[in-house]
């Protein structure tokens, strides 16, 4: 078997069920499937995660940010601790633009809008977040993509990066995400319809603009031709 990052590129589809979307000298962009933790949780039953699988191939890899277990899509992974510091600084300065696609079970009025609600943790196990006057400031931009009798598809752009931000914001305005088992409990089966589709940032190592898009999950592919015509904020 090949060693180092060549082995990683070859092994990711088999070992992690993920796609290696971008291979850069200082970082990787990986497409995480729904149902997989970004990093280990508490207890041996939560050890399996994206980063533990990747580190089985390359121990020096470091996670720059996280997605919820049930959220699919793009995650930035640093190649080493030195790269991690530079990439983490981009997130801290809010210089990484993220674009999500989601299906919500109730329509939102208008074609676009802003959800500006402070969020706080309301419950610890399982963690639940919701609007609270003492919560952390949170802002989410949304734009309608398509609408049917069953659901409304939205582009979402979080301007802040709080835990459960998109899920809690949409639930708070009466439009929870399809198959969200925390904020929209129901008998609906299948993956949660929330996908981190695109990342955009200025590379801190060579100052070039980086734009990365993922392949959409199966639930989002049917209306993709129309969605392409409604790319949000130049990030689609």
Which residues make up each language-model segment?
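RNA pseudouridine synthases
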Residues: 1-236
